[in-house]
Amino acid sequence: MDRAEKKESVAALADVFQKTSVVVVAHYSGLTVAQMQNLRKQMRASGATVQVAKNRLVKIALDGTPVSSISPLLKGPTLIAYSDDPVAAPKVAVGFAKDHDKFVILGGAMGTTALNVDGVRSLATMPSLDELRGKLVGLIQAPATKLAQLTTAPAAKLARVFGAYAAKDDAA
């Protein structure tokens, strides 16, 4: 990699670190190519990205970004996973780490907050933004549905009473 490519890589990483909401750092030593491809595929499916870059270039790109607290974690064969959804990258990383012993989560950052391994794991247990939106819509719709049922209930009772009188008159 020549100097121009390194500058381009640092600029791209710095842009990612400025815009992303969560970054997870992990060791990947000992994983096969197929396992790495599987990890990338799972991350893409959840809206996250995995990138392997030189630690030195990542450290340079981290300077002045909100997630600069992950800099000490960059030792050895590390990868970074990031996503705009604060839960997507940690959720996939934790799930992948459960299945693969050689994939070790080191920590991460969410905004300016540094996360240790337990922080990443607890973040992974939270519902995603879409799940939270679904729950909120359900909570908002439930009272409206009950209100509609209450307003139509007296009319339905009246209709049943009139139907019963009509059936009684027909029978007589």
Swiss-Prot record:
<dbReference type="GO" id="GO:0003735">
    <property type="term" value="F:structural constituent of ribosome"/>
</dbReference>
<dbReference type="Pfam" id="PF00466">
    <property type="entry name" value="Ribosomal_L10"/>
</dbReference>
<dbReference type="GO" id="GO:0070180">
    <property type="term" value="F:large ribosomal subunit rRNA binding"/>
</dbReference>
<dbReference type="GO" id="GO:0015934">
    <property type="term" value="C:large ribosomal subunit"/>
</dbReference>
<comment type="similarity">
    <text>Belongs to the universal ribosomal protein uL10 family.</text>
</comment>
<keyword id="KW-0699">rRNA-binding</keyword>
<keyword id="KW-0694">RNA-binding</keyword>
<comment type="subunit">
    <text>Part of the ribosomal stalk of the 50S ribosomal subunit. The N-terminus interacts with L11 and the large rRNA to form the base of the stalk. The C-terminus forms an elongated spine to which L12 dimers bind in a sequential fashion forming a multimeric L10(L12)X complex.</text>
</comment>
<dbReference type="GO" id="GO:0006412">
    <property type="term" value="P:translation"/>
</dbReference>
<comment type="function">
    <text>Forms part of the ribosomal stalk, playing a central role in the interaction of the ribosome with GTP-bound translation factors.</text>
</comment>
<protein>
    <recommendedName>
        <fullName>Large ribosomal subunit protein uL10</fullName>
    </recommendedName>
</protein>
<dbReference type="InterPro" id="IPR043141">
    <property type="entry name" value="Ribosomal_uL10-like_sf"/>
</dbReference>
<keyword id="KW-0689">Ribosomal protein</keyword>
<keyword id="KW-0687">Ribonucleoprotein</keyword>
<dbReference type="InterPro" id="IPR001790">
    <property type="entry name" value="Ribosomal_uL10"/>
</dbReference>
<dbReference type="InterPro" id="IPR022973">
    <property type="entry name" value="Ribosomal_uL10_bac"/>
</dbReference>
<dbReference type="InterPro" id="IPR047865">
    <property type="entry name" value="Ribosomal_uL10_bac_type"/>
</dbReference>
<dbReference type="InterPro" id="IPR002363">
    <property type="entry name" value="Ribosomal_uL10_CS_bac"/>
</dbReference>
